[in-house]
UniProtKB/Swiss-Prot annotation:
Subunit structure: Homodimer.
Pfam family name, one: polyprenyl_synt
Annotated dimethylallyl diphosphate binding sites: R102, K190, T191, Q229, K246, K255
Cellular compartments annotated: Cytoplasm
Gene: FPS
Name of the protein: Farnesyl pyrophosphate synthase
Activity regulation info: Stimulated by methyl jasmonate (MeJA).
Binding site for Mg(2+) 1: D93, D97
């Protein structure tokens, strides 16, 4: 494990301990144990990409200067705030989607003693973020900007989730509602803001930058987040479950996935009818038929072409940015996700 990742995980223990001894609430042994178990189960279990990228980005913005212990701690704390936000979304998301597994283990709400208590746990996870920010950033000149940033990104993500849910669930299953612009809107709000823009925005604020002056950085990161989600949609169907850590269910769940949107675009009338009949059905035979159609339409090749075009376009945007340090941050992000398998 890299030294920074080790330091990052140490900061998790510090933050957890502070939250379990928060003076605003008198914990009993039971409640403290519950929160600790809930945190350990839901917060540090993923790849930690979003959290670690705050430190990476901050380091690159400092252009190779050695970071002080304080800078490592603070950038890690912001990284963990994003991981907390992610945990809060995922715990509630899994309930809404009736998912079974997450990160290779049963979803939190599926555990026998948890069930719907998970809803309140999600709310607690969300409430931990301002506690962490208050404790460690209250005296910083960018404190209010940080609070604004987290609030705004949370609002954008929840609104993206809403478009996703109402497009997917409300009324009759109607594939004709699905198109690239709808897919793009969902992805932009539901994933790109918190996964791509938020970590870099945190690093920029810590470096004393004004976010208003970096709207082009936001645009590039949202574009990158869109590309990331298209990869995710692709891997949901074509990735190996043991590699991606979950069993893909986008077809059964009638998700507005890039694959189905592309399939609709490329299908003839007969194939469209076939999709309408089989997409969103929970039986393995229908899922297999949809996958077969995806193969007939050569969606793996279509994706490979999309991937290389997106990469070239992003590199062009990034290299037009005036700051070398910001370019380095953006290229580092792109390098982490290009051609990923999980």
């Amino acid at each position: 494990m890299s030294d920074l990742k080790t330091r990052f995980l140490e900061v998790y223990s510090v933050l957890k301990s502070e939250l379990l001894n928060d003076p605003a609430f008198e914990f009993t042994d039971d409640s403290r144990q519950w929160v600790e178990r809930m945190l350990d189960y839901n917060v540090p279990g993923g790849k930690l990409n979003r959290g670690l990228s705050v430190i990476d980005s901050y380091k690159l913005l400092k252009e190779g200067k050695e970071l002080s212990d304080d800078e490592i701690f603070l950038s890690s704390a912001l990284g963990w705030c994003i991981e907390w936000l992610q945990a809060y979304f995922l715990v509630l998301d899994d309930i809404m989607d009736s998912s079974h597994t997450r990160r290779g283990q049963p979803c939190w709400f599926r555990l026998p003693k948890v069930g719907m208590i998970a809803v309140n746990d999600g709310i607690l996870l969300r409430n931990h973020i301002p506690r962490i920010l208050k404790k460690h950033f209250r005296q910083k000149p960018y404190y209010v900007d940080l609070l604004d940033l987290f609030n705004e990104v949370e609002f954008q993500t929840a609104s993206g989730q809403m478009i996703d849910l109402i497009t997917t669930l409300v009324g009759e299953k109607d594939l004709s509602k699905y198109s690239l612009p709808i897919h793009r809107r969902i992805v932009q709000y539901k994933t790109a803001y918190y996964s791509f823009y938020l970590p870099v925005a945190c690093a920029l604020l810590m470096s004393g930058e004004d976010l208003e002056k970096h709207t082009n950085v936001k645009d590039i990161l949202i574009e990158m987040g869109t590309y990331f989600q298209v990869q995710d949609d692709y891997l949901d169907c074509f990735g190996a479950p043991e590699v991606i850590g979950k069993i893909g269910t986008d077809i059964e769940d009638f998700k507005c996935s890039w694959l189905v949107v592309k399939a609709l675009e490329l299908s003839n009338e007969e194939q469209k009818k076939f999709l309408h009949e089989n997409y969103g059905k929970d039986d393995p035979a229908s899922v297999a038929k949809v996958k077969e159609l995806y193969n007939t339409l050569k969606l793996q090749d279509v994706f490979a072409e999309y991937e290389s075009k997106s990469y070239d376009k992003l590199i062009k945007f990034i290299e037009a940015h005036p700051s070398q340090a910001v370019q380095a941050v953006l290229k580092s992000f792109l390098g982490k996700i290009y051609k990923r398998q999980k």
